[in-house]
Amino acid sequence: MTVPMAEPEAHDRRSLHERIAADLRDDIMSGELPPGANLPSTAQLRSRFDASNATIQKALQLLKDERLVVGRAGAAVTAREHRQRTIRPAMSLTPAAPGEPYPWLTEAAKHGTDARIALLDVTETNPPADIRTALGLRHGDAAVLRSQLLLIDDEPAELVKSYYPLDIARDTPLMDHHRIKGGTSTLLRQLGHTPHHCVDRVSARVPTQEQFEALRLPGSLPVLCTLRIVYTADGRPIEATAMVKAGHLYELQYEFAPE
């Protein structure tokens, strides 16, 4: 009889300054260090983590590169204002009122931030396998892709790629190379494809080169990926959107009741 060997004790193989940055990052993300709060002094951090001055400074530099803290010569390092943002996915299906901007822009303005959407590309393409499956397409079937970059205070916030079946998008503003007033949810309603519900698949991944560059990521942090499939009341998928956000700057808030 073979006796299974015990699993070796887990050990964090990251360098010390990365581990220190991870713990301080958690303090910031959890609100233990709220916006504007001073981080512990170098002496306090040395004592807490049993680390040298140089190691503490390397850890703080990581957080500065991630735009989580700000430090000035002769002043304490502080947690930056408005760094972590909460996204409420349920808002995505809310149509804009006539003449009103896309709800995402309105919500950002309520929090005192300047938000805008940059349309990167509109093209007909063969979508990746997960999008084909989501839209019920066969291998070789094409879809219309609208790529956008969402920015808050001129910093990239989210890379968005939305795919639409050709029979829905053909000869409609979905194929136009300009932004859609009120958002695609409003347009789909006008086209007779009223969004009824959506399904989100959320995962944390290592960023691709495109995502790393588009979001101006500071280092080897994961990105938060959401694949959202939008359905009509009769269950037809009419849109599949891949959304990518910097994992250290955003969280998702879901509200639901028991089935």
Tell me what each language-model feature is.
Residues 2-19, 47-48, 58-134, 138-139, ...:
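HTH-adjacent hinge/linker in prokaryotic transcriptional regulators
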Residues 19-37:
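Short helix->loop/beta-hairpin flanking segments within DNA-binding domains
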Residues 113-259:
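C-terminal all-alpha effector/ligand-binding and dimerization domain
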